[in-house]
Amino acid sequence: MFEIHPVKKVSVVIPVYNEQESLPELIRRTTTACESLGKEYEILLIDDGSSDNSAHMLVEASQAENSHIVSILINRNYGQHSAIMAGFSHVTGDLIITLDADLQNPPEEIPRLVAKADEGYDVVGTVRQNRQDSWFRKTASKMINRLIQRTTGKAMGDYGCMLRAYRRHIVDAMLHCHERSTFIPILANIFARRAIEIPVHHAEREFGESKYSFMRLINLMYDLVTCLTTTPLRMLSLLGSIIAIGGFSIAVLLVILRLTFGPQWAAEGVFMLFAVLFTFIGAQFIGMGLLGEYIGRIYTDVRARPRYFVQQVIRPSSKENE
């Protein structure tokens, strides 16, 4: 049996990107939720290259009296998961909770995650109840969840919800992974011995708009497919074999029909030829695009550039910058 260590200090990691309207409420509610734990805590807010006043507000929050806010300023926008990894590299707690800054996942759920982690779980995921998102967002999320479940074999219900708790050894394991395309909930489940999901409330977004546009969701889908499995490459080989066999069969059939009915049959086969040709060309472009995605990610990994560049860290204990 593995010894279950009680949680002594909680670190809350929150990526921030142009969230100046929600920041005061976010900090207030998150601080209140952490105070109710009766444990040591810290709140790490990572500014992911915001163009509004978010970074300045984070610095002020860290420098306030009796603050528990650690502000991490990144030089530009690297994306949600890279920003969270930047936060992971500066945590000091033995339980790390991730949370979005838009307040759609209430910070008041934090004590429930801590209590569940205290039961001995390595990862505590969440499932959003009565999601307050658009039909498009909910449909895209369902498709992504099904893709992940089939690829990884992990029957988690809501990979898109970032309100999650991770034991310190899980976070340390993730920090030792150096691939550029990182999807944290999946990566954490690879290392977790015991994982569980609990239902949580989901609220409407009060401030601003979602940072996940249509194209960002498409990029996320490509990231998930190419960083999880090489199955699409195997499927391309299978598809190529099927197309080759089909093309040969059609060619034989066309020869037989031409010999049987003469050259006038089906406009001398011109239309059929074009149909087959366009089918093959379309399949080739799909395959080339998918191969390009894999090769592009290999190229990115080979360059070994950092996932992010932390420009400044402001801790509450001192106003000096790291």
UniProtKB/Swiss-Prot annotation:
InterPro entries named in the record: ArnC_tfrase (IPR022857), Glyco_trans_2-like (IPR001173), Glycosyltransferase_2 (IPR050256), Nucleotide-diphossugar_trans (IPR029044)
Function comment: Catalyzes the transfer of 4-deoxy-4-formamido-L-arabinose from UDP to undecaprenyl phosphate. The modified arabinose is attached to lipid A and is required for resistance to polymyxin and cationic antimicrobial peptides.
CDD domains per record: DPM1_like_bac
Keywords: Antibiotic resistance, Cell inner membrane, Cell membrane, Glycosyltransferase, Lipid A biosynthesis, Lipid biosynthesis, Lipid metabolism, Lipopolysaccharide biosynthesis, Membrane, Transferase, Transmembrane, Transmembrane helix
SUPFAM superfamilies in UniProt: Nucleotide-diphospho-sugar transferases
Similarity comment text for this entry: Belongs to the glycosyltransferase 2 family.
GO CC aspect terms: plasma membrane
Enzyme nomenclature, EC number: 2.4.2.53
Protein name as annotated: Undecaprenyl-phosphate 4-deoxy-4-formamido-L-arabinose transferase
Coiled coil ranges: none
Pathway note: Glycolipid biosynthesis; 4-amino-4-deoxy-alpha-L-arabinose undecaprenyl phosphate biosynthesis; 4-amino-4-deoxy-alpha-L-arabinose undecaprenyl phosphate from UDP-4-deoxy-4-formamido-beta-L-arabinose and undecaprenyl phosphate: step 1/2; Bacterial outer membrane biogenesis; lipopolysaccharide biosynthesis
Main location: membrane
Enzyme class, broadest EC rank: transferase
Ranges in the topological domain labelled Periplasmic: 257-269
Cytoplasmic topological segments: 1-235, 291-322
GO molecular function per UniProt: phosphotransferase activity, for other substituted phosphate groups; undecaprenyl-phosphate 4-deoxy-4-formamido-L-arabinose transferase activity
Bilayer-crossing regions: 236-256, 270-290
Gene Ontology terms: biological process: 4-amino-4-deoxy-alpha-L-arabinopyranosyl undecaprenyl phosphate biosynthetic process; lipid A biosynthetic process; lipopolysaccharide biosynthetic process; response to antibiotic
Membrane topology: Multi-pass membrane protein
Species annotation: Shigella flexneri
Catalytic activity: UDP-4-deoxy-4-formamido-beta-L-arabinose + di-trans,octa-cis-undecaprenyl phosphate = 4-deoxy-4-formamido-alpha-L-arabinopyranosyl di-trans,octa-cis-undecaprenyl phosphate + UDP
Location(s) in or outside the cell: Cell inner membrane
Signal peptide annotation: none
Domain of life: Bacteria
UniProt-listed NCBIfam families: PRK10714.1
